[in-house]
Amino acid sequence: MNKELASKFLSSIKHEREQDIQTTSRLLTTLSIQQLVQNGLAINNIHLENIRSGLIGKLYMELGPNLAVNDKIQRGDIKVGDIVLVRPAKTKVNTKTKPKVKKVSEDSNGEQAECSGVVYKMSDTQITIALEESQDVIATTFYSYSKLYILKTTNVVTYNRMESTMRKLSEISSPIQDKIIQYLVNERPFIPNTNSFQNIKSFLNPNLNDSQKTAINFAINNDLTIIHGPPGTGKTFTLIELIQQLLIKNPEERILICGPSNISVDTILERLTPLVPNNLLLRIGHPARLLDSNKRHSLDILSKKNTIVKDISQEIDKLIQENKKLKNYKQRKENWNEIKLLRKDLKKREFKTIKDLIIQSRIVVTTLHGSSSRELCSLYRDDPNFQLFDTLIIDEVSQAMEPQCWIPLIAHQNQFHKLVLAGDNKQLPPTIKTEDDKNVIHNLETTLFDRIIKIFPKRDMVKFLNVQYRMNQKIMEFPSHSMYNGKLLADATVANRLLIDLPTVDATPSEDDDDTKIPLIWYDTQGDEFQETADEATILGSKYNEGEIAIVKEHIENLRSFNVPENSIGVISPYNAQVSHLKKLIHDELKLTDIEISTVDGFQGREKDVIILSLVRSNEKFEVGFLKEERRLNVAMTRPRRQLVVVGNIEVLQRCGNKYLKSWSEWCEENADVRYPNIDDYL
């Protein structure tokens, strides 16, 4: 079974990689820099501020905005962890030749002035790119350019790691010894532990509900658990209690916590920080946001605190700065040779420090891909039987492709005695680039969560968290019945919460305008004046709807008149073009910069007091595109705490032929405050 599973994934990953590379190459070779910026695939008007040494053979290139153009960096869709190219701005993207890496500029030695690296940190005023030290000479030439730009490219490292993992899975010989892997390849039946089941006597968090306690008790006593946490049900709090109870049961327990993104694991780390001794926590990889509470656990920062390591790093940085002033290429080369000798010494000392830090820790937090990092796996080189971990926890499992989830299982094979998966398979699956092969799409969109419950139809290992602490009961009602079999309950503390209950909101609104008292509003945009438009400036002509934008603006201004805070409002849409137009109006023209505007996909895991959802689609053919993806809409309608405002054409949803959309729109006609706007009132 392991060979069959690995073979299926290897062919799917290969196809997905090819599709991803072809799509990216086509865009980079056919669009201008400005078009790439508009589509979020490039950042321009930046310059090199500094180069410094990083951990184990890394350089950090720090880039800032060109103040002659803008005082802030327009980040687009580029995020931490993305693979990027850094180039001088005078280079034009080749639009005539086949995709290839092109010589953009040369230094005196004829080397290509182009760097490839990983986005390490991002803010509105600085981007840090992690480079391999082999690019040091090229990187320093960028000081001579007033403008640089960044291009987002395909992350082939991700595909390489998944393929390597699948090959190793296929090579495991029968009979498989690893009990957890036996479950996952359907070679071992799952039988819940009933003989030696021991209930936890005392929970540390007094606010846990019965479903959370049941999930924790089950996970403590069983070697395979899925914690199904719908939106707002306190999944993270449940995991935090579980981790603490594992350490109480066995103080020597070693836990690896993984997730598909930096944000997912950083949230857990942030919550663990005040509850677990600092020396037991270790964060491996590049944190998406270096919060103060997380910095103290970063392997990078902790290793650099070693006095000798710090001294060598400072000497390297000093030599790098001196290189800025050297005009002669020969002198620069000599300087780099000295730097390379220092780096060799630095690597040895860093590896020793890193090994000590890992062994000292009890909880290691990293992404799924980071779980096979050389820092962790190097411990097996000296002792292949070294017991590094006991428990693996994968959070947000439904946002990861299954091959990603196998990375820690294979990298640390025969280590784990317990596997805990947490997530919600009714929210968005991982993003798949393939569009032309249904088998590939199915293989990669079917998550480990989904496949396990198919293998074990009794679902004995699935523990459902049934109380949500986010949404007003009316907002929760349709998602509960349509996606969670009506099992979701609103806690009494949130069941009737409204915008008017916020401390800043005017408590005595006029009788004619009581939007702060209503949890669910729908602006029905039927009619020719609310027709969608294809935005030719965006990739594949993403859709936008100017009429809906006008309604969004009016509703925001109404909320602001009642002193609803800007940062309590979120505006989301399934379409990038609509998001771009909304940002231009709300952020640039109205200067309401604290209102968060995002795609639905980008808002997964977030929440706001009020969410305004612009559906965009309004056409005579009743086409809805990817609105028919139930999980995307489930994410959208479960983001708000106190008010959900939908702006969309009800007739299109009811006549598009999709049962879910028809059911939702009909339910809202009965349960929401439905309004029929006249476009003339909004212009």
Swiss-Prot record:
* EC assignment: 3.6.4.12
Miscellaneous comment text of the record? Present with 1040 molecules/cell in log phase SD medium.
Q: Where in the cell is it found?
A: Cytoplasm; Nucleus
Pfam families hit by this protein: AAA_11 (PF13086), AAA_12 (PF13087), SMUBP-2_HCS1_1B (PF21138)
Q: Main location per UniProt?
A: cytoplasm
Q: Which GO terms describe its molecular function?
A: 5'-3' DNA helicase activity; ATP binding; ATP hydrolysis activity; double-stranded DNA helicase activity; RNA binding; single-stranded DNA binding
Cite the record's note on assembly: Associates with the hexameric DNA polymerase alpha.
Q: Which gene encodes it?
A: HCS1
Q: Where does ATP bind?
A: 229-236
What GO cellular-component annotations does this UniProt entry give? cytoplasm; DNA helicase A complex; nuclear replisome
Q: Sorted alphabetically, which keywords does the UniProt record give?
A: ATP-binding, Cytoplasm, Helicase, Hydrolase, Nucleotide-binding, Nucleus
Specify the enzyme's EC class, one word: hydrolase
Domain of life assignment: Eukaryota
What is the designated name of this protein? DNA polymerase alpha-associated DNA helicase A
Induction per UniProt is: By heat shock.
Q: Taxonomy-wise, where does this protein's organism fall, top ranks first?
A: Eukaryota, Fungi, Dikarya, Ascomycota, Saccharomycotina
**Similarity section:** Belongs to the DNA2/NAM7 helicase family.
Known role? DNA polymerase alpha-associated DNA helicase which may be involved in DNA replication.
